[in-house]
Amino acid sequence: MNAGLERTKTGLFSKLARAVAVCRAVERLCGVSPGLKWPNDPVLDGKKLCGILTELSLEGETARVQELVLGIGINVSQRPEDFTPEVREIATSLVQALGHAVSRPALAAEIIREVDRLCAALAAGETGPYLAEYRRRCVNLGRTVRLLRPDGGGETAEALDIDEEFGLVVRRPDGAVKTVRSGEVSVRGLYGYTE
C-alpha cells in the first residue's frame, strides 16, 4: 500500500483497523466472532489467534508514508501439541476453535477483500466505523488489566475506553485516568492472556 498519508494516522489506524479486518474475514468465512486484545491481537476463547505487524517507509522531509507493508499471521491448522508449552497457554488456532480444517486460500482471499475495504476507508478518511467496531470487539474494556512496560515494570488499571487515536484509556488504582499508547505498554489480563 502506498498511502502518501501522515505517519501517525496511517500507521496506527492501519495496524489496529487491520485487526478488525481480520476479525471480519474470520467471522464471515468461519462463523466464529474473534475479539480483540488491545492493541491488535485477534483472540478466540481468550487465546491469541493472530499476529499483526506493520513496517513503514517514510519520506524524509515530510514524514509522509511512502510504503506500508502489512504482515498478518493467522494460526490456521495448529494443534495444541504444535505450540511450545509456553505458547500453548496463550495461543489457539482456527482448527482448534472449529474442530475442522479451514481453506487457507479462501481465508487469504477474504482477508485481502477486507484489507482492500480498509484501504478505501482510510483513503476516504472514514475511520469511524472501524473505531466503533474495534471498541465493540475489544475484550479488555470494562476489565482490570496489567499494563506491562518494556523495562519489566508495570501496574494494574481498569480499561475504560478506546480513544479516537486507538489509545487505551485506563483508570489507575489512585483514580487517575490516563491514555496509554501502543508501544508504551503491553496489556495482559490479571489471570491470563486476556482475562
Predicted regions span which residues?
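Gly/Ser-rich oxyanion-binding loop with an adjacent helix/lid
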Residues: 37
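Interfacial segments of multi-pass membrane proteins
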Residues: 1-6
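Long, positively charged amphipathic alpha-helical accessory segments at protein N-termini or as interdomain linkers
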Residues: 7-9, 16-34, 44-195
